[in-house]
Swiss-Prot record:
Taxonomic lineage: Archaea, Thermoproteota, Thermoprotei, Thermoproteales, Thermoproteaceae
Pathway per the UniProt entry: Amino-acid biosynthesis; L-leucine biosynthesis; L-leucine from 3-methyl-2-oxobutanoate: step 2/4
Family statement drawn from the similarity comment of this UniProt entry: Belongs to the LeuD family. LeuD type 2 subfamily.
A single GO molecular function term of this UniProt record: 3-isopropylmalate dehydratase activity
Keyword Nucleus: no
Protein name (Swiss-Prot/TrEMBL): 3-isopropylmalate dehydratase small subunit
InterPro entries documented for this protein: Aconitase/3IPM_dehydase_swvl, AconitaseA/IPMdHydase_ssu_swvl, IPMI_Swivel, LeuD, LeuD_type2/HacB/DmdB
Length: 161
């Protein structure tokens, strides 16, 4: 599974309250959630997110266990999230809603805002097309990869009957 897009680079410890503030949790439509993604940190994020790969530092998605965080990013048009590390529950929620995620230690030093990047989720490789740099991350394998390939957990369960 390969994904290519423009990098939007953010910092460490971006929690789910920043990804989608609690006041929007009454909504379930990913497109509506996406209009408010990252609002406290970057109010312009929804305008920049379509076709982008979100690159972040350590502990991305920490905080409360809200599936809407991954849905908001997907609804905003984010193609994938690459981070130095993830909160475990966000990582699984992203896979369950069909949002590709890849852990790649050191990614923030090697990718700048606006760089063109290509992810190989199965191989755990990030290529910075702009600079030629290759970053080796942790490959996604097994059931999480199968769920992601199916487009999320619900699609996986429908197709496995």
């Amino acid at each position: 599974m390969k994904i290519r897009g423009r990098a939007l680079v953010y910092g460490d410890k971006i929690d789910t309250d920043v990804i989608i503030p609690a006041k929007y949790l009454v909504y379930t439509d990913p497109a509506l959630l996406g209009q408010h993604a990252m609002e406290p940190l970057d109010p312009e994020f929804p305008k920049k997110a379509k076709g982008a790969v979100l690159v972040a530092g350590r502990a991305f998605g920490m905080g409360s266990s809200r599936e809407q965080a991954a849905l908001a990013l997907k609804g905003a048009g984010v193609l994938a999230v690459v981070a130095e590390s993830f909160a475990r529950i966000f990582f699984r929620n992203a896979i369950n809603v069909g949002l590709p995620v890849l852990q790649a230690p050191g990614i923030r030093e090697k990718v700048k805002d606006g760089d063109e990047v290509e992810l190989d989720v199965e191989g755990g490789i990030v290529r910075n097309i702009t600079t030629g740099e290759v970053i080796v991350g942790k490959p996604l394998r097994g059931l999480p990869l199968e769920i992601l390939k199916a487009g999320g957990l619900l699609n996986y369960l429908k197709n496995s009957r």
